[in-house]
């Protein structure tokens, strides 16, 4: 890979930052879904990451996933030194402090205590923070699997419009003195961003898809086609489902070894549905499949393939 202007392009890696509020009254996934809070939450994340890791040239958000009650931020690192700086800020608590400060201001709370987790692939980096070299190796091994999400570009445009609108009213002391106050008054004065898909839909390959709880047919389709990758999908689902966290997957593999891969995969989703109830949705499964390069299985679940193997 060719070096960029600052030599950062030679070193590129990816990680996932899990952010969850410890306050029952603050659910970050809900706040990010709210049209009038979304820009403020994005701005808070962006500001905290810039403070702890550097400019978007070296630390970029690729996508923000909602996984009730968490937000999962996919990060792209360009450059070993900026990544090391981010890891030190994470280890020393500077990133947590910056996020808590920014999110409290964005959501009009006195404080928003946070629980954070950092993962690179299957590695939970929180347990490895004392070994920075190993953390860097884990992040480097996870090459970004996507370009920046279009939704984040739209939020960036909305934020830029918001800043321009505030600058044009620089004589208004109330606006200028509280740039991180709840965005409702400011957003009403500027052109809002394009509305997100309704809460009951999600985007798949750029198209809105109706979200719903997983059905028995979904579980059967998944179990029939996923094969050996059921454990990888389980690793993705376990981030937002405590019932699937270690050693649950190993237990499933052992308990249903005689029955084979179909039963192991079926029982994985059965446990997911039992634990999450109506929150065990099609969207969460499809995102886990996409993360593990199982797009064709996602298309089967969504009914987007015809019997001849082409797109419906």
Curated annotation (Swiss-Prot):
Keywords, in A-Z order: Apoptosis, Cytoplasm, Cytoskeleton, Glycoprotein, Nucleus
Motif Nuclear export signal per UniProt: ranges: 147-163
Keyword set includes DNA-binding: no
Domain Death: start-end pairs: 179-289
Coiled-coil annotated residue ranges, if any: none
Paired cysteines (S-S): none
A GO MF term: signaling adaptor activity
Biased composition (Pro residues): 180-195
UniProt subcellular location: Nucleus; Cytoplasm; Cytoplasm, Cytoskeleton
Chain span(s) of sequence motif Nuclear localization signal: 231-244
GO biological process: apoptotic process; canonical NF-kappaB signal transduction; cellular response to tumor necrosis factor; extrinsic apoptotic signaling pathway; extrinsic apoptotic signaling pathway via death domain receptors; positive regulation of apoptotic process; positive regulation of canonical NF-kappaB signal transduction; positive regulation of cell migration
UniProt-annotated stretches for the region Interaction with KRT14 and KRT18: 222-289
PTM info: (Microbial infection) Glycosylated at Arg-235 by enteropathogenic E.coli protein NleB1, C.rodentium protein NleB and S.typhimurium proteins Ssek1 and Ssek3: arginine GlcNAcylation prevents homotypic/heterotypic death domain interactions and assembly of the oligomeric TNFRSF1A/TNFR1 complex, thereby disrupting TNF signaling.
Record-level GO cellular component terms: cytoplasm; cytoplasmic side of plasma membrane; cytoskeleton; cytosol; death-inducing signaling complex; nucleus; plasma membrane; receptor complex
Tissues where this protein is expressed: Found in all examined tissues.
Region (Disordered): 170-195
Annotated glycosylation sites: 235, 245
Domain of life: Eukaryota
InterPro entries: DEATH-like_dom_sf (IPR011029), Death_dom (IPR000488), TRADD (IPR035712), TRADD_N (IPR009095), TRADD_N_sf (IPR036729)
Task performed by this protein: Adapter molecule for TNFRSF1A/TNFR1 that specifically associates with the cytoplasmic domain of activated TNFRSF1A/TNFR1 mediating its interaction with FADD. Overexpression of TRADD leads to two major TNF-induced responses, apoptosis and activation of NF-kappa-B. The nuclear form acts as a tumor suppressor by preventing ubiquitination and degradation of isoform p19ARF/ARF of CDKN2A by TRIP12: acts by interacting with TRIP12, leading to disrupt interaction between TRIP12 and isoform p19ARF/ARF of CDKN2A.
Recorded domain comment: Requires the intact death domain to associate with TNFRSF1A/TNFR1.
Subunit structure: Stimulation of TNF-alpha receptor TNFRSF1A leads to the formation of two distinct signaling complexes. Plasma membrane-bound complex I is composed of TNFRSF1A, TRADD, RIPK1, TRAF2 and BIRC2/c-IAP1 or BIRC3 which interacts with CHUCK/IKK-alpha, IKBKB/IKK-beta and IKBKG/IKK-gamma promoting cell survival. Subsequently, TRADD, RIPK1 and TRAF2 dissociate from TNFRSF1A and form cytoplasmic complex II with FADD and caspase CASP8 promoting cell apoptosis. Within complex I, interacts with TNFRSF1A/TNFR1, TRAF2 and kinase RIPK1.
Name the record gives this protein: Tumor necrosis factor receptor type 1-associated DEATH domain protein
Organism (species): Homo sapiens (Human)
